[in-house]
Design a protein with these regions (language model features):
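Rossmann-fold NAD(P)H-dependent dehydrogenase/reductase core
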Residues: 2-217, 295-300
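Residues within alpha-helical segments
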Residues: 59-62, 104, 192, 244, ...
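Mobile gating loops/cap/lid regions near enzyme active sites that modulate substrate access
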Residues: 222-223
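Pocket-edge positions in alpha/beta enzyme catalytic cores
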Residues: 50, 74, 235, 274-277
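C-terminal helical subdomain
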Residues: 2, 183, 207, 230-272, ...
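Amphipathic terminal alpha-helices
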Residues: 280-300
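A generic structural signal for short coil/turn motifs at secondary-structure boundaries
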Residues: 109, 272-275
Length: 300
């Protein structure tokens, strides 16, 4: 079977696959690797449901690619919008071959507190947990996949204790990239927790590092000082088609059928932050997150 590398693109990963009759959900489809994931899956015959902060943004993205796509509004900064998106997706009355948690923000200069948490934990982790747990029943029995776009920042930037549970709103101090790192660790730990929960249904869950992609919409939230480093970081970056490769690999390639609870980079298994393998850490993250959602998210 073909081996893919950091240079592989999403289209190369899907080159020999016919995805006709398959359904995929991609969050954050308006730009960057989310848009490329939407485009590549649709180009290979899949029906792709794409979410964005507004219906207009989702529709623009879907209209920009050939193939069968459906736009859905889902502002992950707002739990009410996420719950509305759940209802809209359920109304489609389809089963999904994969749900791809791609939407995210990175290192805004201010914490932007809402629901008692800063924006990165809210947008990147909590809203995905809300969306995925309420839609997990729509994943195909025996073959469905959950794919969470995490990051190497889960290892490189997350605090040594994993998540600052006593400082989720940043009131004890806010370092943008530290909070970004913990939100990406939360994505990884959530995927591992879901792998355990979904195993009995024959559904797999994995997380990934897409690579450093500087031409993505993710950098829109960066502060001025952080932007000064973009040209340097860009020297080590991937193209958007390369950045979407591992996502498409985990979502659709037969090589990873049945493999669950993993962390991948460059379409290969990678070493995760050790906290993600700690069952007690994952349980605490789940319990704290579930409590926040129970308090602030509307009922189904």
């Amino acid at each position: 079977m073909q081996t893919f590398t950091k240079h592989s693109t999403a289209d190369e990963v899907l080159a020999d696959l016919d995805l006709s009759g398959k359904n995929f959900l991609v969050t954050g489809c308006a730009a960057g690797i989310g848009l490329e994931t939407l485009r590549s899956l649709a180009a290979h015959g899949a029906h792709v449901v794409g979410t964005a902060r507004s219906l207009a943004r989702a529709k623009t993205a879907c209209d920009s690619v050939p193939g069968h796509t459906t736009p859905i509004a889902c502002d992950q900064d707002d739990f009410t919008s996420v719950v509305a998106a759940v209802r809209d997706i359920q109304a489609l009355q389809i089963k999904f071959d994969a749900i791809i948690g791609n939407a995210g923000i990175m290192a805004p200069p201010q914490p932007n507190v809402r629901y008692g948490v800063e924006s990165q934990f809210r947008v990147n982790h909590l809203s995905h947990m809300l969306l995925v747990t309420r839609l997990s029943g729509l994943l195909r029995e025996g073959s469905g996949r959950l794919v969470m776009v995490s990051s190497s920042a889960a290892q490189g930037f997350a605090p040594k204790q994993g998540v600052l549970f006593d400082n989720l709103d940043g009131h004890l101090g806010y370092k943008p990239f530290t909070f970004y790192g913990q939100s990406k660790l939360a994505n990884l730990a959530f995927a591992k927790s879901m792998a355990e929960q979904l195993q009995g249904r024959g559904i797999v869950a994995n997380a990934l590092h897409p690579g450093v992609i500087m031409s993505t919409d993710l950098t829109r939230s960066l502060g001025y000082v952080s932007r000064l480093f973009l040209p340097i970081v860009g020297l080590f970056s991937k193209s958007i088609p390369q950045g979407a490769a591992t996502t498409c690999y985990l979502a659709a390639h037969p090589a990873v059928a049945g493999k669950t609870g993993g962390f991948y980079a460059d379409c290969q298994p990678a070493k995760p932050n050790p906290h993600a393998d700690d069952a007690s850490f994952r349980q605490r993250l789940w319990d704290v997150s579930a409590a926040i959602l129970a308090q602030h998210a509307p009922a189904a």
